[in-house]
């Protein structure tokens, strides 16, 4: 057993000296366990991950838990391997921390459960799958204008409080209820309260049986927040590689992964790059994102909430993430202020799947006409603001009327928000979505009041509501 001793503790950074020629490898997990000397002393039980070899038989490590109670001279044991987490069926319905320890007060995970290291290589080129298949979400604005690809990476962009987490919760709910698929949720540096709410909501709806959850929340040290996404991904990879499943990996929030990496980088004494981020930003992001992919056996589809600092899309953190995405869902504060939920910007959201070869001619044409109508309305808004509606031509007035109906019809109630809104949520199949928007564009519902289109599911519900309004 290879042991060393702590020589220095600086917050979450711990230096450990080993005997000559017995340095642990980079990314190895080291364990520190020590009973408190008396009643008032803290019991120490912390895992450290080797980050740097400093020379002089010393390694610099990052703590995955609180370093309270650590003192110089404390014995440290090298486990000889990277941090590993449980994988397989035992993870479903359970909540874990970054080290794969259950934190849900349920039965402990069996000691003989299979485990996998969190640091792994991305799948080789020859193992990757190239076929493109659409993932139906039941959310109209997503399915119509920025459809998700199975095995793709999707980014949910938005500032604070525009609805990223609610959208993620709705996607987990819809995928589990409609597709019966396995999901892994990685809570990276977000609010503990949200994780708690999500767990209870999923338990109530029964979705939890098909979900594994891994949390490293805001109150955790930066080491845990930086590695928790890898822990969740490792669990998802097992279902893909060993069971051939199509798995959904939700990461909330990928910005916190970058933020934690930035903290760790500063603590390790690296020179910062642009806006104070770590110099290894692109490398760290690439190591995580390249493991999220479709292979010939199964797929991992990842949906990542991406906080945009001060709504600045040129910030290096969101900009680096953009490079890896197949589809983006942009949430816009102006829409949420208008009461349009989900507040997805129909013109800024993109997907490489929106092409006639993948979604079909009809879907593509309807989506493009919807975007053209909304774009024309956006251009006319300045004229309306200065001169009023009366100065528009009859043709433009019609475009504005249809655009407003489209804008409202892109909203819908969510199942996971029922307890707040009191309105039942709706799941709308893609065919119904295309039919509804096609008929609005054809002018079939020009005579119905605008408010009938707000927060409904299918077009038939609009007609029903319009009758009640009369």
UniProtKB/Swiss-Prot annotation:
Its main location: membrane. It comes from Halalkalibacterium halodurans (strain ATCC BAA-125 / DSM 18197 / FERM 7344 / JCM 9153 / C-125). It catalyses: ATP + H2O + 4 H(+)(in) = ADP + phosphate + 5 H(+)(out). Keywords: ATP synthesis, ATP-binding, Cell membrane, CF(1), Hydrogen ion transport, Ion transport, Membrane, Nucleotide-binding, Translocase, Transport. It comes from the Bacteria. PROSITE patterns: ATPASE_ALPHA_BETA. Its EC number is 7.1.2.2. The keyword Disulfide bond does not apply. InterPro entries: AAA+_ATPase (IPR003593), ATP-synt_VA_C (IPR055190), ATP_synth_F1_bsu (IPR005722), ATPase_a/bsu_AS (IPR020003), ATPase_alpha/beta_chains (IPR050053), ATPase_F1/V1/A1_a/bsu_N (IPR004100), ATPase_F1/V1/A1_a/bsu_N_sf (IPR036121), ATPase_F1/V1/A1_a/bsu_nucl-bd (IPR000194). Belongs to the ATPase alpha/beta chains family. Pfam families: ATP-synt_ab, ATP-synt_ab_N, ATP-synt_VA_C. It is found in: Cell membrane. It is a peripheral membrane protein. The lineage of its organism: Bacteria, Bacillati, Bacillota, Bacilli, Bacillales. ATP binds at residues 158-165. It is an enzyme of class 7 (translocase). GO terms for molecular function: ATP binding; ATP hydrolysis activity; proton-transporting ATP synthase activity, rotational mechanism. This is ATP synthase subunit beta. GO terms for cellular component: plasma membrane; proton-transporting ATP synthase complex. F-type ATPases have 2 components, CF(1) - the catalytic core - and CF(0) - the membrane proton channel. CF(1) has five subunits: alpha(3), beta(3), gamma(1), delta(1), epsilon(1). CF(0) has three main subunits: a(1), b(2) and c(9-12). The alpha and beta chains form an alternating ring which encloses part of the gamma chain. CF(1) is attached to CF(0) by a central stalk formed by the gamma and epsilon chains, while a peripheral stalk is formed by the delta and b chains. The keyword Signal does not apply. Produces ATP from ADP in the presence of a proton gradient across the membrane. The catalytic sites are hosted primarily by the beta subunits.
